[in-house]
Amino acid sequence: MDSKTVGILGGGQLGRMIVEAAHRLNIKTVILDAAKSPAKQINALDDHVDGSFTNYDSIVKLAEKADVLTVEIEHVDVDALIKVQEKFPKVEIYPLPETIRLIQDKYLQKNHLIKHDVAVTESVAVETNTVDDLLHIGEKFGYPYMLKSRTLAYDGRGNFVVKDKSYCEKALEFLKDRPLYAEKWCPFTKELAVMVVRSLEGEVFAYPTVETIHENNICHLVYAPARIPDTLAKKASILAKNAVKSFLGCGIFGVEMFLLENNELLINEIAPRPHNSGHYTIDACVTSQFEAHVRAVTGLPMPKGFTEFSTSITNAIMLNVLGDKATPNKELEICRRALETPHASVYLYGKTTRPERKMGHINVVTSSMQDAESRLSYILGDTTEIPKSLATDKESPLVGIIMGSDSDLPVMAVGARILKQFGVPFELTIVSAHRTPHRMSEYAIEAPKRGLKCIIAGAGGAAHLPGMVAAMTPLPVIGVPVKGSTLDGVDSLHSIVQMPRGIPVATVAINNSTNAALLAIRILGAYDSKWLTEMNQYMLNMETEVLGKAETLEEIGYEDYLTDKLKK
């Protein structure tokens, strides 16, 4: 695909997955790291360099073999990179050494972002690493506050919570002689992340906003998309893109942020490389974060939409596989359960097991977060058997049929049969707007998260159910007026059809759940073309049926036709 050879400083799991992406594009890669590192295990070339990515001579050897240098870890020797750039002016280095230096020092990183009007957590440099220094910071920020190493820190290593004055000495003992800075305590409600890829021209593309769950300061789970309102997800995406725009050079960047209780977003830190929070992209997105990085540093095309989810209904959970604390290789039991689970993919890194070491990850990709969570539950061993719905790979419902009373069931069952005829997964239940208002509210709000794409709501009399549900969900709602005992359903029809502006409800004829189901299938066609194909076939069948009747009528005459019809 490209004649450039990419030299990678670092041969860990991130380098390994960069190599995999580059191989698919016929791009040669050479690795600088220890012999038999994870990236070298899957690239059997003799050109690799055994050595340290912080050693000038080793970096020179790598530069002699490459057209482009990039990093899988930011803890490289930037001064050495700059010297190499001077020695080999034709060798491109991405991200630029200046960018790597800025991001390496987390305090400089924050000051850089502040200068570019990017919201970050409040912080201050620690000048002399003394107890008095930390006490003064405590007076400024209050307790607790976070003391952090400015450099060589990741996965919580280099962080210490200063809970009160008595912890100041302990903090200095723990962090020793590192350069330090302090952050004001940030009472976040969620941790979010956005992968952003930057082209050499400065154009940025954001992957979906995700939610990260940490245990012992190590990323444990990633939910994609994040379990937050779409407006907040978009806000996070804009913040991440603005942050990455402020740096020079190209490549993929991992942007971590905090979501506060007041819905304010603050950047926590940025990594100038592929990131753990982006591993889900391998299976869930059009292009993985690793391929995006390769494209960026080699100047390959990055078309609009290449960082989006593969489908509009994609939901994914990434699980980190860590070395077991007690029993070596016990973590492989999780991997085995994942291999038994439909829609789960296992990625192992070729590492020797150590407690809490990142040994691999598992991606679970389905059409709803509820489905993904069910599969994850089995993988983690929370359930001992694969749920029947997973064993049979039963599809999650796409359409919800609800009614105010079981007396509406004879009407709504007709629509259910239509959905069943088409093979559309659906659910059917009773939700009363007046008798179970809390249940109705919960059903409407949670419906999108459960993977529903459309709701059919049948109601008679006052018929408030369709409108109330439509007011609480962004999904399309189809109202079915049910014929009552007094006004023949006209009251229900008028109630459903007369919705105020801004709260649309598609309303079908009285008792006509058939059309409601058919309309729901057409709506599904906007998500998946197979439903358009099914609907087109249904319409052709109707045409064939009517043409057949017309032919018979014309052949035998209306009197015999009517006699035969009455007999039936």
Curated annotation (Swiss-Prot):
Residues involved in ATP binding: 138-193
Catalytic activity: 5-amino-1-(5-phospho-D-ribosyl)imidazole-4-carboxylate + H(+) = 5-amino-1-(5-phospho-beta-D-ribosyl)imidazole + CO2
GO biological process: 'de novo' IMP biosynthetic process; adenine biosynthetic process
Domain of life: Eukaryota
Mutagenesis or variant effect for C219W: In strain: ATCC 32354 / B311
MF (Gene Ontology): ATP binding; metal ion binding; phosphoribosylaminoimidazole carboxylase activity
PANTHER family: PHOSPHORIBOSYLAMINOIMIDAZOLE CARBOXYLASE, PURINE BIOSYNTHESIS PROTEIN 6/7, PUR6/7
Protein name as catalogued: Phosphoribosylaminoimidazole carboxylase
Family: In the C-terminal section; belongs to the AIR carboxylase family. Class I subfamily.
Residues of the signal peptide: none
UniProt enzyme class: lyase
Outcome (variant: L332S): In strain: ATCC 32354 / B311
The keyword Nucleotide-binding is assigned to this record: yes
Domain ATP-grasp stretches: 110-298
Pathway assigned to this chain's UniProt record: Purine metabolism; IMP biosynthesis via de novo pathway; 5-amino-1-(5-phospho-D-ribosyl)imidazole-4-carboxylate from 5-amino-1-(5-phospho-D-ribosyl)imidazole (carboxylase route): step 1/1
Protein EC: 4.1.1.21
A matching Pfam family: PurK_C
Keywords tagged on the record: ATP-binding, Decarboxylase, Lyase, Nucleotide-binding, Purine biosynthesis
Disulfide topology: none
